Amino acid sequence: MTEVKLDFQKQGGLIPAIILDHTSKEVLMLAYLNEEAYQLTRTSGQMWYWSRSRQELWHKGATSGHYQTVKKITADCDLDTLLIEVDQLGAACHTGAKSCFFHPIWDEKDGKTD
């Protein structure tokens, strides 16, 4: 694994992570990692996040059984955002949907906005 110095301080100790399905490349969710969640993710191979609402570490799937197994982690050019590809077991969204992104707002085909 390549070691890089991620910039956790730029955004108050948290780094946003865009989570993609490894096979389909569908965006599943956006969540945040603090340094501890990042280290747990790297060492365990499963996704750990920092819950901003509960102010605690969150092991994705520990309650729901919808685990995310890490396949690839890439940092952006500023080292302050992550793109993480996972194998998703079950739904990624707490609503039970596969992806958290399911509210259409605008589509270039019809040029309409919500």
Curated annotation (Swiss-Prot):
Enzymatic reactions: 1-(5-phospho-beta-D-ribosyl)-5'-AMP + H2O = 1-(5-phospho-beta-D-ribosyl)-5-[(5-phospho-beta-D-ribosylamino)methylideneamino]imidazole-4-carboxamide
Principal EC category: hydrolase
Positions that bind Mg(2+): 76, 78, 80
- Which pathway does the database say it acts in? Amino-acid biosynthesis; L-histidine biosynthesis; L-histidine from 5-phospho-alpha-D-ribose 1-diphosphate: step 3/9
Q: Which UniProt keywords apply?
A: Amino-acid biosynthesis, Cytoplasm, Histidine biosynthesis, Hydrolase, Magnesium, Metal-binding, Zinc
Q: Which SUPFAM superfamilies match?
A: HisI-like (SSF141734)
S-S bonds: none
Protein's cellular compartments:
Cytoplasm
Q: Which residues bind Zn(2+)?
A: 77, 93, 100
* GO cellular component: a single term: cytoplasm
Entry keyword Transmembrane: no
Gene Ontology BP terms: L-histidine biosynthetic process
Q: How is the cofactor bound?
A: Binds 1 Mg(2+) ion per subunit.
Question: Its Enzyme Commission number?
Answer: 3.5.4.19
Q: Which domain of life is it from?
A: Bacteria
Please give one Gene Ontology molecular function term for this protein. Answer: phosphoribosyl-AMP cyclohydrolase activity
Point out the signal peptide segment. Answer: none
**Pfam families reported in the protein's UniProt record:** PRA-CH
Keyword Amino-acid biosynthesis found: yes
Q: Which family does it belong to?
A: Belongs to the PRA-CH family.
The free-text function statement in the UniProt record for this protein reads: Catalyzes the hydrolysis of the adenine ring of phosphoribosyl-AMP.
Q: Share what the entry says about its subunit structure, partners included.
A: Homodimer.
Identify this protein by name: Phosphoribosyl-AMP cyclohydrolase
- Organism from which the protein derives: Streptococcus sanguinis (strain SK36)
